[in-house]
């Protein structure tokens, strides 16, 4: 079996975890108490959903997941919520004091007290796996636990499980709205620390998702529940090929092989279609061509940036539902003829396709319409460098005045770490710039240097 272990860190990670597991349970027909009426084989570990759920002798299905937060309130909601019986109490780990939006607290002072406990729980989960394929880590960039503790955990996972892939789902600080003043510091410190430990990081920015909820679902004031359910759909689409049988299935390592041209350039942009409310869906027939085109609209992206200004390096289309290869090929052929979509010249084909016959499931009483087919596009584009540039600029404004730095130094960090992290991100921006340059020009320039 190719099992995946999900690790949800901090408030954002835990709340997205709730949305994801709620959706997985609905998709697989697993009840909140872990029973699965449709699964006749007790303890049989060969069903494809066993990548995400382990099965006890009593026929109970337990998520292969760990929830960690440095303060108890958010995880307590899981402990008392609808799905409280689904999780083993040991999978829900909380500390007593908050990381207080401070990377240094999450990474050094408070994080180090709890990290061994978390790794121990992860080890117990990995012992139940026959062929662990990797970890999915959910966290935010802006919070103290999400930035500091997640990066500490990933460093330690690299030591203990060197060869296993680690995929991140990270909540990137929104351009306009901010939940903490020190977000730019935390984001840049965590990106610098995890850059070498993460194999692939899918970024999601709250503002982009707010806009999608407002525009496509007509929700005037989207709540985090609305956002998380939408994020849940996306995560579900990315992991669907691991949990269901399909025509063209995609494995965790396959994402990396097809999306990451260079180790550092591992931040694919995620687009999902169709996001549509129930009343609208009733009147529209969403064909494969339509949803494929929708993926290339910046309005459907999960991070605010404009791919029309950048170039695509690789593109992964994950279809689910009533989709046949013939339609997909036709849709992609049409996309390739459009001038607005530019690929780097060193990557001529650039499309990888996955097809899964399980149609998208929606949460009852949610905002999304039940549709016959959906697509999630993961694209590695140079445009995402805009997001880094934005963040770096905010960091520079604050760091020039050394604002708030004493909180970090007081928790045992050194000021040198700030400048080191900032230099690393400057290098990352440069890397993105260089991949986008056409190779022919590049060769000519190299000739002049010698």
UniProtKB/Swiss-Prot annotation:
Its EC number is 3.6.5.-. Mg(2+) binds at residue 71. One of its GO terms (molecular function) is structural constituent of cytoskeleton. Its cofactor is Mg(2+). Keywords: Acetylation, Cytoplasm, Cytoskeleton, GTP-binding, Hydrolase, Magnesium, Metal-binding, Microtubule, Nucleotide-binding. Some glutamate residues at the C-terminus are polyglycylated, resulting in polyglycine chains on the gamma-carboxyl group. Glycylation is mainly limited to tubulin incorporated into axonemes (cilia and flagella) whereas glutamylation is prevalent in neuronal cells, centrioles, axonemes, and the mitotic spindle. Both modifications can coexist on the same protein on adjacent residues, and lowering polyglycylation levels increases polyglutamylation, and reciprocally. The precise function of polyglycylation is still unclear. The active site is at 254. It catalyses: GTP + H2O = GDP + phosphate + H(+). Testis specific. SMART domains: Tubulin, Tubulin_C. The modification N6-acetyllysine is found at residue 40. It holds the Pfam family Tubulin_C. One of its GO terms (cellular component) is cytoplasm. GO terms for biological process: microtubule-based process. Dimer of alpha and beta chains. A typical microtubule is a hollow water-filled tube with an outer diameter of 25 nm and an inner diameter of 15 nM. Alpha-beta heterodimers associate head-to-tail to form protofilaments running lengthwise along the microtubule wall with the beta-tubulin subunit facing the microtubule plus end conferring a structural polarity. Microtubules usually have 13 protofilaments but different protofilament numbers can be found in some organisms and specialized cells. Tubulin is the major constituent of microtubules, a cylinder consisting of laterally associated linear protofilaments composed of alpha- and beta-tubulin heterodimers. Microtubules grow by the addition of GTP-tubulin dimers to the microtubule end, where a stabilizing cap forms. Below the cap, tubulin dimers are in GDP-bound state, owing to GTPase activity of alpha-tubulin. The MREC motif may be critical for tubulin autoregulation. PANTHER family: TUBULIN. This is Tubulin alpha chain, testis-specific. The lineage of its organism: Eukaryota, Metazoa, Chordata, Craniata, Vertebrata.
């Amino acid at each position: 079996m190719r099992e995946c272990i999900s690790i949800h860190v901090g408030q954002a990670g835990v709340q997205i975890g709730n949305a994801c597991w709620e959706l997985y349970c609905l998709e697989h027909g697993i009840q909140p108490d872990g029973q699965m009426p449709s699964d006749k084989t007790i303890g049989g570990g060969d069903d494809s959903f066993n990548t995400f759920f382990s099965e006890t002798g009593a026929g109970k299905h337990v998520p292969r997941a760990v929830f960690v937060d440095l303060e108890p309130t958010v995880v307590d909601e899981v402990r008392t919520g609808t799905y409280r019986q689904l999780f083993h109490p040991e999978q829900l780990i909380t500390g007593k004091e908050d990381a207080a939006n401070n990377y240094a607290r999450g990474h050094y002072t408070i994080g180090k007290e709890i990290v061994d406990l978390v790794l121990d729980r992860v080890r117990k989960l990995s012992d139940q796996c026959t062929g662990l394929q990797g970890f999915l880590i959910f966290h935010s960039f802006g919070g103290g636990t999400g930035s500091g503790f997640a990066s500490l955990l990933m460093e330690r996972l690299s030591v203990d499980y060197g060869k296993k892939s680690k995929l991140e789902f990270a909540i990137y600080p929104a351009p306009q709205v901010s939940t903490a003043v020190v977000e730019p510091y935390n984001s840049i410190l965590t990106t610098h620390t995890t850059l070498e430990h993460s194999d692939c990081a899918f970024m999601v920015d709250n503002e982009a998702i707010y806009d999608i909820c407002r525009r496509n679902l007509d929700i005037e004031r989207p709540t985090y529940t609305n956002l998380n359910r939408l994020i849940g759909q996306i995560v579900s689409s990315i992991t669907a090929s691991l949990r269901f049988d399909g025509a063209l299935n995609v494995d965790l390592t396959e994402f990396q092989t097809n999306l990451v041209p260079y180790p550092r350039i591992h931040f694919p942009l995620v687009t999902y279609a169709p996001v549509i409310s129930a009343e609208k869906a009733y009147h529209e027939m969403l064909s494969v061509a339509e949803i494929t085109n929708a993926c290339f609209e910046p309005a459907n992206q999960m991070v605010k940036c404009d791919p029309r200004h950048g170039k695509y390096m690789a593109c992964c289309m994950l279809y689910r539902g009533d989709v046949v290869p013939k339609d997909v090929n036709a849709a992609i052929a049409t996309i390739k003829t459009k001038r607005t979509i530019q690929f780097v010249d060193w990557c001529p084909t650039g499309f990888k396709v996955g097809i899964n016959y399980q149609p998208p499931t929606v949460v009852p009483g949610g905002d999304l319409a039940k549709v016959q087919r959906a697509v999630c596009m993961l694209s590695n584009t140079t445009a995402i460098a805009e997001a880094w540039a934005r963040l770096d600029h905010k960091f520079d404004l604050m760091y020039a005045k050394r604002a708030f730095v004493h909180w970090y130094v007081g928790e045992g960090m050194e000021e040198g770490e700030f400048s080191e992290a900032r230099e690393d991100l400057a290098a990352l921006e440069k890397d993105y710039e260089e991949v986008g340059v056409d190779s022919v020009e590049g060769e000519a320039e190299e000739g002049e240097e010698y």
